[in-house]
Structure formats: C-alpha cells, structure tokens
Regions:
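Feature captures C-terminal
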Residues: 2-168
C-alpha cells in the first residue's frame, strides 16, 4: 500500500482465513488471499486520531484463564472478526494488553520521534475501513487526500510484476 500510495503510514486488515502464497504465486493465489473488491484511499490523520484507531485494534487482545494472551471474545462472538484487527506500517509502538481498553498503545512514534496528538500524517487504508466499518468511526472524520481506484488484487499483481522475487 505504501508503494502505490506514497502515504507516510499504512493500515491493513486481513481476512479471517487466508490461503497464503506458495513459492510461485498465481493470480488465483492472489484472489484467494485477498477476496474483497476494495480500493485504497489516503487520508490525513492526527496523532490523536491515529492512537484512537490503534486502540481499537488493541482491543483484539485479552487473557485466557491461564494468563496467556488470546483473542478477545469481542472479536469472536457473536461472529469471528479477525478482519477487524488492523496491522500498521510506518510507526513504532507496543500493545500492552495488561492495560485497560483505550490505554494499551504505548511508545507510539514515527521515525524515532513520539507521535503527538496534533501531529499530522497521511495514512493509506482500504475504502471499506475508511467508511468507518469495524468500529473505526474515527476515519470518517479524516480528510480524504486521494483515492486509488484500482482494486487491491490488481495492485498486488502489479507489485509482483514489478518485484518478481520477494523474500519473506
């Protein structure tokens, strides 16, 4: 997403079940891994708003009866919603599941500098999440910078054409 958008940050959620890629990737593999017809948007987000959406993702974690980190019931009941946990690129942070909900993101920084409430960033995410879906209402308050009206599957294929050998 960063490659195609030029944004400072990126946020992505993955499907509940992912087929994954083999050593040689086909178009079918890409479609199976990213089955949604989403496109990308870039919006402007403040440090405070960024922390708020990251706190929503941090709600994903809980502790089981033995004290082990697990997935929170709120992401499992009444239906499994792993796709509502978002991954973030372009910032450093720590999630501390021992803290109460709303106070779990620690050490949020960009390029080694603390992300302050009034700081402004550009973030790339899919159009579904930008609509506020999944409990991410804050995105609806973020000004749109640009839309990339190409479906994700096509962008992923373009990336593989440009970079045919990728190490993971």
């Amino acid at each position: 997403q960063l490659h195609f958008s030029g944004a400072m940050l990126s946020s992505v959620g993955l499907a509940n079940e992912i087929a994954g890629f083999r050593s040689e990737v086909s178009t079918r593999d890409i479609i199976a891994t990213y089955p949604y017809p989403n496109t990308l948007v870039v919006c402007e987000i403040t440090g405070k708003q960024l922390k708020t959406v990251m706190e929503r993702s941090a709600e994903y974690f809980a502790y089981d009866k033995d004290g082990n980190v697990c997935v929170s019931d709120s992401f499992l009941i009444p239906k499994v919603e792993h796709y509502n946990y978002d991954y973030y690129m372009g910032v450093d942070f720590k999630i501390n599941p021992e803290n109460p909900i709303g106070s779990r993101i620690e050490g949020l920084s960009k390029d080694g500098k603390p992300a302050l409430d009034d700081d402004k960033f550009t973030i790339c995410l899919n159009n579904y999440r930008y609509s506020g879906a999944g409990g991410y209402d804050v995105y609806t308050e973020c000004p749109l910078v640009k839309e990339i009206n190409v479906e994700m599957v096509e962008l992923i294929m373009d990336y593989f054409h440009e970079y045919p050998y990728i190490e993971v």
